[in-house]
Amino acid sequence: MLSRIVSNNATRSVMCHQAQVGILYKTNPVRTYATLKEVEMRLKSIKNIEKITKTMKIVASTRLSKAEKAKISAKKMDEAEQLFYKNAETKNLDVEATETGAPKELIVAITSDKGLCGSIHSQLAKAVRRHLNDQPNADIVTIGDKIKMQLLRTHPNNIKLSINGIGKDAPTFQESALIADKLLSVMKAGTYPKISIFYNDPVSSLSFEPSEKPIFNAKTIEQSPSFGKFEIDTDANVPRDLFEYTLANQMLTAMAQGYAAEISARRNAMDNASKNAGDMINRYSILYNRTRQAVITNELVDIITGASSLG
């Protein structure tokens, strides 16, 4: 008789604890898996993802110093070039609309082929689209697969040339010169009254902004108000040579700036992903332990109930 009373009390105690666990599950929105095995598999998957994001953050951090050096080096050349155009008072010429509706502007949009770096590519695509609202007939050259895929959705007819294989490493002048040569030979870039380069400018280690950089063609350079103040040989090819060099150099500057912004954005994105994965691991670890406790509780109830019936 005494053993039966003790057994009944133990049964009521275990069943009460089981009911409390069940109430806890109903109020916990994290619990989306019915079995212990599913929760365990989910937890293992999140831990594997956390390892990947942490590794990618470390890789991005090591590349960031190299990207910063490339950005600073390109910026020095850009500052010297901008000083020349400032002293020459060079500005884009006002071009009236043509009767045939021919493109008045060439847009060069620069990103890379890689993702997992936040909204850096989509933000640049939005900036290009806003610019196209004012210049719907502009021709577009995309550098990098990401910007190409973004603009193909809305402006497929404007894209005339696409270049990929960009962003694997810090850009060099040789790389930018090859791209500039392709723009001159394939797109006849020198015939456009206006050329605009769109790229991502790193404002700080945590932020960036899409920027636009104008490129002056040979005719614009030659007609600069103060261009004659410089001691230049009588060679008629000087404005053209200066334009071609400027195109390559500005491409390098934009690519270096964009590369640094992308690496920084990827590091921040992977850092946030690692933190989110850590939070999910904590939540699912609690869920796993509670689910496991519920399984043990059910087994205890079955054992005690069976013992009571046998007694």
Swiss-Prot record:
Cited SUPFAM superfamilies: ATP synthase (F1-ATPase), gamma subunit
Presequence extent in this chain: 1-33
InterPro entries: ATP_synth_F1_ATPase_gsu, ATP_synth_F1_gsu, ATP_synth_F1_gsu_CS
Result after altering residue 297 to A: In ATP3-5; dominant suppressor of the slow-growth phenotype of yme1 strains lacking mitochondrial DNA
Record carries keyword Mitochondrion: yes
Record's subcellular location: Mitochondrion; Mitochondrion inner membrane
Cellular component terms (Gene Ontology): mitochondrial inner membrane; mitochondrion; proton-transporting ATP synthase complex
Taxonomy, superkingdom: Eukaryota
Assigned keywords, A-Z: ATP synthesis, CF(1), Hydrogen ion transport, Ion transport, Membrane, Mitochondrion, Mitochondrion inner membrane, Transit peptide, Transport
One GO MF term attached to the UniProt entry: proton-transporting ATP synthase activity, rotational mechanism
One BP annotation, GO: proton motive force-driven ATP synthesis
Membrane topology recorded in Swiss-Prot or TrEMBL: Peripheral membrane protein
Pfam families assigned to the protein according to its UniProt record, in alphabetical order: ATP-synt
Quaternary structure, from the entry: F-type ATPases have 2 components, CF(1) - the catalytic core - and CF(0) - the membrane proton channel. CF(1) has five subunits: alpha(3), beta(3), gamma(1), delta(1), epsilon(1). CF(0) has three main subunits: a, b and c.
Free-text function comment from the UniProt entry: Mitochondrial membrane ATP synthase (F(1)F(0) ATP synthase or Complex V) produces ATP from ADP in the presence of a proton gradient across the membrane which is generated by electron transport complexes of the respiratory chain. F-type ATPases consist of two structural domains, F(1) - containing the extramembraneous catalytic core, and F(0) - containing the membrane proton channel, linked together by a central stalk and a peripheral stalk. During catalysis, ATP synthesis in the catalytic domain of F(1) is coupled via a rotary mechanism of the central stalk subunits to proton translocation.
Family the entry assigns: Belongs to the ATPase gamma chain family.
Further comment found in the protein's record: Present with 28100 molecules/cell in log phase SD medium.
Protein name: ATP synthase subunit gamma, mitochondrial
